[in-house]
Amino acid sequence: MSQKGLIYSFVAKGTVVLAEHTPYSGNFSTIAVQCLQKLPTNSSKYTYSCDGHTFNFLVDNGFVFLVVADESTGRSVPFVFLERVKEDFKKRYEASIKNDERHPLADEDEDDDLFGDRFSVAYNLDREFGPILKEHMQYCMSHPEEMSKLSKLKAQITEVKGIMMDNIEKVLDRGEKIELLVDKTENLQFQADSFQRQGRQLRRKMWLQSLQMKLMVAGAVFSFILIVWVVACGGFKCSS
């Protein structure tokens, strides 16, 4: 990762930027706000590309987390950063976010569930959480190997989810219905139960055969001892 990997970050509620940080100068914030106002509503993750930079957005429960990154950084690492910021933000302010009390930043239509009394205007949160954004950016920049491993892990998880969905779609594309899949499952369960019953019967049969063999051996040994005793002692008249 280059030293200029992560450039600018903010947290917004709706279209209102609540906290931001950047160690660089530029018009990143202006472009980011323009992108924010045009975010699609059907996706929780979105990336715009502009002049060798990516504007990466993560949307969660009405809150928008953004990071501007150098295009060479890729998409995985910026979203690992955004997940870290989101979890930290929720951990710090979840109680206030769930508060039903109206907040000065609330929009007319959709911002009913906002913050409590902890901060009354946007710059209070910027002053409080802006330095946290800085810490996360510095940490991610100084731990590229960890970020790379996390991004690969998330990519693998996403790939597995895609494979599972792909497999289901392939089954359905072949014309097999869910009912048939259920029937197959029930049939497999019946076969498993039948196999268990056969296994128990086989073990019982083997146990009986083993017991029979032991009784035969014991009878033979007893008969041999009895014959030796009769020969040696002359039947039942053996004297000391």
Swiss-Prot record:
Record-level GO BP terms: protein targeting to vacuole; vacuole organization; vesicle-mediated transport
Span of the signal peptide: none
Vesicular membrane side: 237-240
InterPro entries linked: Longin-like_dom_sf (IPR011012), Longin_dom (IPR010908), Synaptobrevin-like (IPR001388), Synaptobrevin-like_transport (IPR051097), V_SNARE_CC (IPR042855)
Keyword Ribonucleoprotein: no
Bilayer topology: Single-pass type IV membrane protein
Domain Longin: 6-133
Subcellular location: Early endosome membrane; Endosome membrane
Alphabetized Pfam families for the sequence: Longin, Synaptobrevin
Intervals, Cytoplasmic compartment: 1-215
Residue span(s) of domain v-SNARE coiled-coil homology: 149-209
Any one of the GO CC terms: SNARE complex
Physiological role: Involved in the targeting and/or fusion of transport vesicles to their target membrane.
UniProt protein name: Vesicle-associated membrane protein 727
Organism for this UniProt entry: Arabidopsis thaliana
Name of encoding gene: VAMP727
